[in-house]
Curated annotation (Swiss-Prot):
Protein name: Rubredoxin
Single GO BP term: oxygen metabolic process
Provenance organism: Clostridium acetobutylicum (strain ATCC 824 / DSM 792 / JCM 1419 / IAM 19013 / LMG 5710 / NBRC 13948 / NRRL B-527 / VKM B-1787 / 2291 / W)
Function text: Rubredoxin is a small nonheme, iron protein lacking acid-labile sulfide. Its single Fe, chelated to 4 Cys, functions as an electron acceptor and may also stabilize the conformation of the molecule. Functions as an intermediate component in the electron transfer chain: NADH->NROR->Rd->FprA1/2 in which Rd serves as the proximal electron donor to the FDPs that exhibit H(2)O-forming NADH oxidase activity. Also functions as the proximal electron donor to the Dfx and revRbr proteins that display superoxide reductase (SOR) and NADH peroxidase activity, respectively.
Keyword annotations of the record: Detoxification, Electron transport, Iron, Metal-binding, Oxidoreductase, Stress response, Transport
InterPro entries the UniProt entry points to: Rubredoxin, Rubredoxin-like_dom, Rubredoxin_dom, Rubredoxin_ET, Rubredoxin_Fe_BS
Cofactor: Fe(3+)
Domain Rubredoxin-like span(s) in chain numbering: 1-54
CDD domains in the record: rubredoxin
Cofactor comment: Binds 1 Fe(3+) ion per subunit.
Segments forming a coiled coil: none
Length: 54
């Protein structure tokens, strides 16, 4: 699964880790995160994330 990076603050969403503090279980692909999820560091929406080149 591909990682995604926040273009505002640089936070990297790693599907292997998820975002359990905000209700996203490990193993959840970026596409399957709810549309109302926001970056846990800066609060922007999913539309401010791009696929990581890593």
């Amino acid at each position: 699964m591909k990682k995604y990076v926040c273009v505002v603050c640089g936070y990297i969403y790693d599907p292997a880790e998820g975002d359990p503090d905000n209700g996203v279980n490990p193993g959840t692909s970026f596409e399957d995160i709810p549309d109302d999820w926001v970056c846990p560091l800066c609060g922007v929406g999913k539309d401010q994330f791009e696929p990581s080149e890593e």
